[in-house]
């Protein structure tokens, strides 16, 4: 339902106004509504940290731009666990590292590390 980092939050488009206010006050970040690849539960469709956002591979360019604007980081497309598009279902990431499902392939790991800033 919520995709957030230290700079902003991107949330389910139908989230009630009261919930938006709670997120703004709790996280102290601006909040924008939207979806990714027609997935309204954006926290399932993407994973963010303070360096980047890995998004559902069918996310459209305008959706990526909206996420980049909301979270103030670069967004890219990717998958996990041998092609699963709902990256938030099997990837947890912070600024210091990540944990991903054991079926994730080498190329998928490379995309995760590049997008989320774990490659120097």
Protein language model features and the residues they cover:
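The feature marks the mature, well-folded catalytic cores of soluble enzymes
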Residues: 1-120
